[in-house]
Structure formats: structure tokens, C-alpha cells
Amino acid sequence: MQRFGFLRCRVGLVALAICFTCDAAPAWAQPYPNRPITLIVPLPPGGSNDIMARAVADKLSASLGQQVVVENRAAGGSGTVGTRQTAKSAADGYTLLLGYTSTLATGPSMHRDVGYDPRKDFAPIGLIAAAPSLLLLHPDLKIRSVSELIAMMKSADPPFQVGVPGIGTVNHLASVLFAHQAGVKVQQMPYKGSNALITDLAGGHVKVGFNPIPVSRAALESKLIVALAATSLRRSTALPDVPTVAESGLPGFDAVLSYGLLAPAGTPRPIIDTLNKDLRAALATEEVKQRLLQEGAEPMPTTPEEHAAVIDREETKWSTLIHSVGLKAE
């Protein structure tokens, strides 16, 4: 009887433990996601970054069964401030970042202390798209090739002025890379945004500039400016008749903006995989493809590992250029 009572006691304890386990399981094993997700865009509404985020947010909301809410945190620093804030968020999959080249590759070298390490503080989920910029001219120059422009720049005294939308942006560094590879001296003319540059370029106040496709399209269609070349290795689907800088005399020239989704480092891999799967599905839809192409961007579905490799490659490339030409951190 004593032995039977001991066994009954053990069975009771096991049953009690199972009950506690069942009660506790939902606290840590609830399916993801079970509440809305915040997607941080570290820049103001209306720009290319905002459009990229919203292009995929609706599709992700539908496939995940929870709302993906785009939140703009335009706190300055070319997006580095909002990026730093996201890096410090909980690694639970409920706060994501729209990361791009200027915050993940050029920002850490162009700003003295961004407060985050792109390689260590984030878990890449996948790329969304890549977008080239354009080498633009005022029509009065009557130049028809990159080689003609380089020849004019080499003979210019004082150095040729080149308009760029901001310091430390990919467009700014595209102009630096162009001068570096062409062996010419230029004077960068920074503007407070792409629209201000287009206004001055169309008015002839500056004769050459690097600018994104979407902001430049209306002035191009009105023939107020001329697209001499695209900054990607391959021609842009949005402007297939515009040659690339690489095919026009500077082999290997490549300066594009990459956009992608990231989570804070330490986010569980199953969550990363779920988000990557649904992101790739969103990029495969015709609706998202067309929306990205309107921005001059090419959809770029990748694995998390491929996304990480792009960040690493771009950071190495741009930091090497920044240091080799002696650009100073702000």
C-alpha cells in the first residue's frame, strides 16, 4: 500500500507539472506574429525610402495576418538617428527597419558616431530593391557622351561644379567615385534635397548633377535636362535607352541605392525566415514590381545571407573610397 501511494503521488506530481507546462507555453510559444508590426522608415514621408516600405507593407500585412504599420522617424543624420533607435529595439520581430545604402554603408563612415554597427546590430531579412541614379546635364552643354564630359572636366579651370543632393548620400559619393575613376577634379555643390538640385539644373545654375530617377523624370520628359548615363552596372529597366557610366568609358562604375528589411540583432531565426518568405512573395507580385519600377528601382529578392553580403560589400566599397580620397566625417 505504501508503494502504491508513493507511485500515485509521483503520477500526481507529473500531471501537475504537465498542467503548469501547458499553462506556461503560450507565454513563449505563441505563433508569430500575434500583434501589429512596426516598420521604421528613418526619413520623412513621401521619399523613395517611404515608398519602398509602403510598397511591401500592404502585402506583408495580408500574408502575415497582422498589420505592418509604417512609421516615419525623421530625426536627422540622413536616417542614421532613426536607424540607431531601431537597433536598440526589442529583438522580437515586432520592430523592423527599412535600411538603405546611406544608413548601412556610407553613414558609418561619413558621420563620426552613428551609434550602431550595421554588421553587428542588425539581422538582415532580405533586399527589397536596388535603384540607380542618373548623371544629368543641362542641355546647353551639348555633350553627348561620358568621354566628352570627362575631356571637358579635365580642361576646366577652376574645377567643374557638380550638383549633389546632400553630403554623404550615394549621389554625392557617385560624383566622388566618378571623379576618382575619371582622374578629374570637380567641386561638389551640395543641395538640400533632390528637388532643389533639379530646379537649379533645369535653370542652368549648375550644369552637371547626380540625382535619383523619380525626382528627375518630369524634367527629363520636358527636356529641361538630359540624362547622360545611369550609375548602375546594367541599364535601368525604367530608362532602357540611357547607357550606363560603366559602358560609356568607366568600366566597373557602380553606384546604386539598395533598400532592404532588417530586424534588431538577436531576432530568432524562425521569425527572420517567416519575414523573408513573405517579403519574397510580395516582390513576386506584379503590383509591387510595377510600383518599384515607377521609382526606377529593380526588385531584388534575396536570402538573409545574400542581403548581409550586399551590406558588407557596399560598406567595404564606400568606406574604402571615403578614406582613399580623404573625405572627412561630419
List each language-model region with its residue ranges:
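N-terminal (or domain-start) structured segment
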Residues: 28-120, 159-161, 167, 183-210, ...
